């Protein structure tokens, strides 16, 4: 299996013609509700015959969109990729009505939400190893 590594000089075109179509063909989008009204938005990319799971944890004031390239690389290498968006980020629930703010009552909320999604991944993929990949706050 050959994975195309995107070139900086042609990045936008390769994202549009290689990465995005591939992810669209293997991806699903869903919400998990840990507490009433608190829906965690998650992207899930499942390649043919995955051998393990990788949980991607994005950084502060980021969202799943920014991680399409790394999700592509992991999926092409046979990983089932889960990419939940933390509270206050992307399409996940917020603790304030102002969508321009990322407000959190307790940092443990990020940890507990991420564990909740990871348990779902474990249930959906019995016997598979689960790896964590985080960036910055993630």
List the predicted regions and their residue ranges.
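Structural cue for short, hydrophobic secondary-structure segments
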Residues: 56-59, 83
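Active-site glycine-rich loops that stabilize anionic/oxyanionic intermediates
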Residues: 51, 58-62
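Alpha/beta-hydrolase fold active-site loops
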Residues: 51-54, 129
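An N-terminal hydrophobic leader/cap segment in hydrolases
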Residues: 1-33, 40-46
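Alpha/beta-hydrolase active-site loop
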Residues: 102-123
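Conserved alpha/beta-hydrolase
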Residues: 64, 71-97
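Donor nucleotide-sugar binding loop of glycosyltransferases
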Residues: 38, 63
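Alpha/beta-hydrolase fold nucleophile elbow
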Residues: 125-136
